[in-house]
């Protein structure tokens, strides 16, 4: 069994390395687009599947009480077979990945902060996710928590560590299922958000791809009119906005330790609109706005203040005798337009073309769009789907190069997360069958480094009882019993480990080892050679920093 699993791990790694050279075209699909009126209505049948490598159904959520999957629109997604109709597209497009996103701006952050706070609620969520993906035949999960550690959104200081734990535990669960599910995340590029909530090197190692939301970098909240996805810094960018552009934002992810071939660059298929201050005749970038208006006037199909889909912009701005004046941001490489008190900054074929060439120059993994349903899919301004066609033209013929590692700033010791266990091929095999598991002292030893994640067993649960289609709380799922693993040479009470409120428990005999409860099972992890487990900080540290006197000597 050990040899078989080791072989599978090697094959999986070889497959991943091979697939990394293929650029990604990630298309987010907002399921509520079906409710837009008239020509704005967008259904699953309108998705240009052949233009995407990954399509992500948006969104599912998390329940308030038991931290399980929440189906936000059960009538559309379940009763009308939205999920199944979406994943059934695979039959005619077998090379495309059909994933689902959890989160989104409207979901807030407090529920997610609560979910990751305790290992029990994380496990509840993970079991629910596994059941959900199996039931509706998705190819993976995209994490769109906006944002870990964001106090202004109901987050907690501990979210940064706990989000990483969630990602690691999801990865282990997905590997154990053995269906090749992908795990990705949509992330911000503002430095303060990364500092608050993201262990960048570790997340980039665990996730298949990082979808950088390189848009909404300006908006009505800023107090001035501007394009919201500028490629480069402009002369008027000051203070917090000086580095808030696509080029500097992606560089920041690299600088913090993320390989370039894990980064997917976000391209908005929509614009941000503004209402200018009364009597303001200055229509340039950074001009004064009426902030109390909340943004520009709603457009006819998306019907949201301060927000226009690309097809709503092109039908208005590019129309003959429309009265709109169209301009170009020379440094930011984006168009903007104005008429009267209305001002909108957006992306068009010219700006998207520039960004595609820039992605290839930088060696990034590909491009993603929020959202595919806001392209000119009806051909109201000319050909259908002009923006996604540009993404496909460039990315389908582009081979992603190996990552470049220069200019990476080492993570300070105090900011590093606790050590993570190694690949299972280096330690005991993951059980792949289920038999009775005793309730007392199951223990496992895993040889580890501080950079790679182990894949412990994940309980299989009853699909029907583990997914909430409405916010009412459901009974806690009952996991099936797992294989008993022989105890290790270092006897520890497994029930003591798993009943503890602590995520990390130092080994009583060995200074360089510690224990964690993973999916109800006590697992032992080892620090790198020459380091010991720091009980106070829950990290592997130099012996001189050890809080246990007996561990202060190497």
Curated annotation (Swiss-Prot):
PROSITE patterns: CHIT_BIND_II, GH18_1, GH18_2. Residues 1-19 form the signal peptide. Glycans are attached at residues 85, 303, 545. GO terms for cellular component: extracellular region. Epidermis and gut. Chitin binds at residues 76-77, 103-106, 147, 213-216, 370. The active site is at 146 (proton donor). Its main location: secreted. Residues 495-553 form the Chitin-binding type-2 domain. Its EC number is 3.2.1.14. InterPro entries: Chitin-bd_dom, Chitin-bd_dom_sf, Chitinase_II/V-like_cat, Chitinase_insertion_sf, Glyco_hydro18_cat, Glyco_hydro_18_chit_AS, Glycoside_hydrolase_SF, Glycosyl_Hydrlase_18. GO terms for biological process: chitin catabolic process; polysaccharide catabolic process. Residues 23-398 form the GH18 domain. Residues 467-477 have a biased composition (Basic and acidic residues). Keywords: Carbohydrate metabolism, Chitin degradation, Chitin-binding, Disulfide bond, Glycoprotein, Glycosidase, Hydrolase, Polysaccharide degradation, Secreted, Signal. Belongs to the glycosyl hydrolase 18 family. Chitinase class II subfamily. This is Endochitinase. The lineage of its organism: Eukaryota, Metazoa, Ecdysozoa, Arthropoda, Hexapoda.
């Amino acid at each position: 069994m050990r040899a078989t699993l080791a072989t599978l791990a090697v094959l999986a790694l070889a497959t991943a390395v091979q697939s990394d050279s293929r650029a990604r075209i990630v298309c987010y699909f907002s399921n509520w687009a079906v409710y837009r009126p008239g020509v704005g209505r967008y259904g699953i049948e309108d998705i240009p599947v052949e233009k995407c490598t990954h399509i992500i159904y948006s969104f599912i959520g998390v329940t308030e009480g038991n931290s399980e999957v929440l189906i936000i629109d059960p009538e559309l997604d379940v009763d009308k077979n939205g999920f199944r109709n979406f994943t059934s597209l695979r039959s005619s497009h077998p090379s495309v990945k059909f994933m689902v996103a959890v989160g989104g701006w409207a979901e807030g952050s407090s529920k997610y902060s609560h979910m990751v706070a305790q290992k029990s609620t994380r496990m509840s969520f993970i079991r629910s996710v596994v059941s959900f993906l199996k039931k509706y035949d998705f190819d993976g999960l995209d994490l769109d928590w906006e944002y870990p550690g964001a106090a202004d959104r109901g987050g907690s200081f501990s979210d940064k560590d706990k989000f990483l734990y969630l990602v690691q535990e999801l990865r282990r669960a997905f590997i154990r299922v053995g269906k090749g599910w992908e795990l990705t995340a949509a992330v911000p590029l503002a430095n303060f958000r990364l500092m608050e909530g993201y262990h960048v090197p570790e997340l980039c190692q665990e996730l298949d791809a990082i979808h950088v939301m390189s848009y909404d970098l300006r908006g009505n909240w800023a107090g001035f009119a501007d394009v919201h996805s500028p490629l480069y810094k402009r002369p008027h960018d000051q203070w917090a906005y000086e580095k808030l552009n696509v080029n500097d934002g992606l560089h920041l992810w690299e600088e913090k330790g993320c390989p370039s071939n894990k980064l997917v660059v976000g391209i908005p298929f929509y614009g941000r609109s503004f209402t200018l201050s009364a009597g303001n005749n200055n229509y340039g970038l950074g001009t004064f706005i009426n902030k109390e208006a909340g943004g520009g006037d709603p457009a006819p199909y998306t019907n949201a203040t301060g927000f226009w889909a690309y097809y709503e912009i092109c039908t208005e701005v590019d129309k003959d005798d429309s009265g709109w004046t169209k301009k170009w941001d020379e440094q930011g490489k984006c168009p903007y337009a104005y008429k009267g008190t209305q001002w909108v900054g957006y992306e068009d074929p010219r700006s998207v073309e520039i960004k595609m060439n820039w992605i290839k120059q930088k060696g990034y993994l590909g491009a993603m769009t929020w959202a595919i349903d806001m392209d000119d899919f009806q051909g109201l301004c000319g050909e259908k789907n002009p923006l996604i066609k540009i993404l496909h033209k460039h990315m389908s013929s582009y081979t992603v190069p190996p990552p470049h590692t220069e200019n990476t700033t080492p993570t300070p010791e105090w900011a590093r997360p606790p050590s993570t266990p190694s690949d299972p091929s280096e330690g005991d095999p993951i059980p792949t069958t289920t038999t009775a598991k005793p309730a007392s002292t199951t223990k496992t030893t895993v040889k580890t480094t501080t950079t790679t994640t182990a894949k412990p067993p994940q309980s299989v649960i009853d699909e029907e009882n583990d997914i909430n289609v409405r916010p009412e709380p459901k009974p806690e799922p009952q996991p099936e019993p797992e294989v008993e693993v022989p105890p290790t040479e270092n006897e520890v009470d497994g029930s003591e480990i798993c009943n503890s409120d602590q995520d990390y428990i130092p080994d009583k005999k060995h200074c360089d080892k510690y224990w964690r409860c993973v999916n109800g099972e006590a697992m032992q992890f080892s620090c790198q050679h020459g380091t010991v487990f720091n009980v106070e900080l829950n990290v592997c540290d130099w012996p001189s920093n050890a809080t246990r006197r007996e561990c202060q000597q190497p």
